[in-house]
C-alpha cells in the first residue's frame, strides 16, 4: 500500500466520496441546500484530514469500512469551516471556483455551513458504534469545534491589530489544527 496522502486517497477515495454523499441522502434539503452539497461534492479539496483518519486506522489493522463515517465527518466539518471562513474573509473563490456565499448568497452559505456541522454531529451520534467511545468522540469533536471557532475569532481580531509570530502560531493551532 502507498501510505502517502495521494496513495491513501487513490485506494479509498471512492469509498470516502460515497460516505460523504451518504451523510446527506436521508436529509430532505430544499433545492438550494441540495445544490450546495452537490457543488461541494463535485469540487473536493485535498482531503488531507480524512486521508489521515483512513490511513491511520488501516495502518493499525482496522477495517476501512469501520472508520469511513468518521473520515466523512472530519471532511464535512472542515468544509463547513471553510464556508464560514470565506464569508468572514470575503473570499470570492475557493478551490478555483466561486465560494459558496459568492455563488448562492450569504444567508444560504451560513445555513449550509450550519447544516453541515449539525449533520456531522448527528452522524457521529447516530453511528452504530458502542455508546462510550461514540460519546468520547462526540465530546472531542465538540471541543475541537470550540477551539476552531476561537482560532477563527483570533484571526478576525488579529486582522485589525497585526500579529506576532506567537499569536499566529496559536491562531493556526486553533483554526486548522483543531480539526
Regions found by a protein language model. Name each.
Residues 1-24:
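N-terminal amphipathic/basic leader segments beginning at the initiator methionine
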Amino acid at each position: 500500500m502507498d501510505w502517502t496522502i495521494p496513495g491513501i486517497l487513490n485506494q479509498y477515495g471512492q469509498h470516502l466520496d460515497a460516505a460523504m454523499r451518504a451523510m446527506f441522502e436521508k436529509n430532505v434539503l430544499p433545492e438550494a441546500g441540495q445544490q450546495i452539497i452537490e457543488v461541494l461534492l463535485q469540487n473536493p479539496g485535498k482531503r488531507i484530514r480524512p486521508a489521515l483518519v483512513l490511513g491511520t486506522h488501516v495502518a493499525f489493522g482496522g477495517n476501512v469500512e469501520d472508520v469511513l463515517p468518521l473520515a466523512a465527518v472530519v471532511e464535512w466539518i472542515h468544509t463547513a469551516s471553510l464556508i464560514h471562513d470565506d464569508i468572514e474573509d470575503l473570499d470570492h473563490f475557493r478551490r478555483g471556483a466561486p465560494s459558496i456565499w459568492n455563488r448562492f448568497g450569504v444567508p444560504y452559505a451560513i445555513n449550509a455551513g450550519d447544516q453541515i456541522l449539525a449533520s456531522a454531529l448527528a452522524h457521529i451520534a447516530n453511528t452504530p458504534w458502542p455508546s462510550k467511545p461514540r460519546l468520547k468522540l462526540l465530546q472531542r469533536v465538540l471541543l475541537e469545534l470550540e477551539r476552531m471557532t476561537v482560532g477563527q475569532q483570533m484571526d478576525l481580531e488579529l486582522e485589525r491589530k497585526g500579529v506576532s509570530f506567537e499569536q499566529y502560531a496559536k491562531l493556526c493551532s486553533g483554526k486548522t489544527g483543531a480539526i
